[in-house]
């Protein structure tokens, strides 16, 4: 029986893994945008776009490879929500993706973060940078993943979860 509980975003807290590289993930129906942070958690940058692959699971395998290659301490997956704090099928899909990814990369934690407006913000930023709509298709998912991860990094700073403790 499918899980019908509405997924909710996580918040940085006492279970923060501390200093280390993080991945941001923007889950779409066709593509997945991936970003990473520097080890100090200051800046998110684009990494790549991965095609969704329900049959072969190459999307999960590629993200797991990145987690290992980059020594990632935490993965942040965008949770699409509407203006009324509600969730729909996209949010359930992202939450299911995050849950399965978490099982595959354990013990690395996978968090959900509110991603309202990230794609819109990414489109605007790319447009302002002179990137045409047609050219955005290949990088918009990465730009959204950057926005998702950067928001998480800023939440961590506001909560004092930088992991600077010895």
Swiss-Prot record:
GO cellular component: cytosol
Compartments it resides in: Cytoplasm
Any one Gene Ontology molecular-function term assigned to this protein's record: nuclease activity
Region annotation Disordered: where it falls in the sequence: 1-24
GO BP: rRNA 5'-end processing
InterPro entries: RNaseH-like_sf, YqgF, YqgF/RNaseH-like_dom, YqgF/RNaseH-like_dom_sf
Superkingdom of source: Bacteria
Keywords, comma-separated and alphabetical: Cytoplasm, Hydrolase, Nuclease, Ribosome biogenesis
One Pfam family, short name: RuvX
Any coiled-coil regions, as ranges: none
Listed EC numbers: 3.1.-.-
Family per record: Belongs to the YqgF nuclease family.
Known role: Could be a nuclease involved in processing of the 5'-end of pre-16S rRNA.
Cited NCBIfam families: RNAse_H_YqgF (TIGR00250)
Protein name: Putative pre-16S rRNA nuclease
Organism: Mycobacteroides abscessus (strain ATCC 19977 / DSM 44196 / CCUG 20993 / CIP 104536 / JCM 13569 / NCTC 13031 / TMC 1543 / L948) (Mycobacterium abscessus)
């Amino acid at each position: 029986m499918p899980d019908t509980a509405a997924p909710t975003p996580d918040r940085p807290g006492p279970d923060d893994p501390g200093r280390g590289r993080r991945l941001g993930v923007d889950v779409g129906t066709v593509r997945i945008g991936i970003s990473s942070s520097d080890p100090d958690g200051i800046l998110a940058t684009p990494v790549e776009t991965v095609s969704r692959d329900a049959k072969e699971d190459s999307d999960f395998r590629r993200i797991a490879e990145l987690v290992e290659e980059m020594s990632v301490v935490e993965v942040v997956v965008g949770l699409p929500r509407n203006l009324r704090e509600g969730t729909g099928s996209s949010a359930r899909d992202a939450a299911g993706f995050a849950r399965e990814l978490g099982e595959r990369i354990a013990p690395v934690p996978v968090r959900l973060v509110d991603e309202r407006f990230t794609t819109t913000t990414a489109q605007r930023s790319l447009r302002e940078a002179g990137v045409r709509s047609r050219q955005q298709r290949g990088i918009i998912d990465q730009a959204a993943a950057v926005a998702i991860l950067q928001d998480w990094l800023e939440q961590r700073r506001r909560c004092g979860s930088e992991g600077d403790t010895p």
